Amino acid sequence: MAKRVQTKKKVRKNIASGVVHIQSTFNNTIVTVTDVAGNVISWSSAGGRGFKGSRKSTPFAAQMASEDAVKKAMAQGLQTVEVYVKGPGPGRESALRALQAAGLTVTMIRDVTPIPHNGCRPPKRRRV
């Protein structure tokens, strides 16, 4: 008879404050919740919530992703957060509003979108 392999139970940390990173591109929105040291507590994305194709880039999809990530983090005791927003996508504001509606105390909002000092050549203009 095979021996039973002992698995470690997931340790529930009690984290009071953390950092929420919202990466909003034109195609998707990714929300990552970390502790102050940068260790990931939970994450979610519009694509991971079941939105496919162009529906991933909607503000509603960003709101759902944000609610999902925050719900997982609040189960571990998260209460106050700092928010870092990156990217030009349509889900920026709605993801942020979903955080505040979930009951988290937002202490700081910072835009960390990388802006080139004339770096790489951008993609060609779309002709629709």
Curated annotation (Swiss-Prot):
It comes from the Bacteria. GO terms for cellular component: ribonucleoprotein complex; ribosome. Keywords: Ribonucleoprotein, Ribosomal protein, RNA-binding, rRNA-binding. The keyword Phosphoprotein does not apply. Gene3D superfamilies: Ribosomal protein S11. GO terms for molecular function: rRNA binding; structural constituent of ribosome. InterPro entries: Ribosomal_uS11, Ribosomal_uS11_bac-type, Ribosomal_uS11_CS, Ribosomal_uS11_sf. SUPFAM superfamilies: Translational machinery components (SSF53137). It holds the Pfam family Ribosomal_S11. GO terms for biological process: translation. Located on the platform of the 30S subunit, it bridges several disparate RNA helices of the 16S rRNA. Forms part of the Shine-Dalgarno cleft in the 70S ribosome. Part of the 30S ribosomal subunit. Interacts with proteins S7 and S18. Binds to IF-3. This is Small ribosomal subunit protein uS11. It comes from Desulfosudis oleivorans (strain DSM 6200 / JCM 39069 / Hxd3) (Desulfococcus oleovorans). The gene is rpsK.
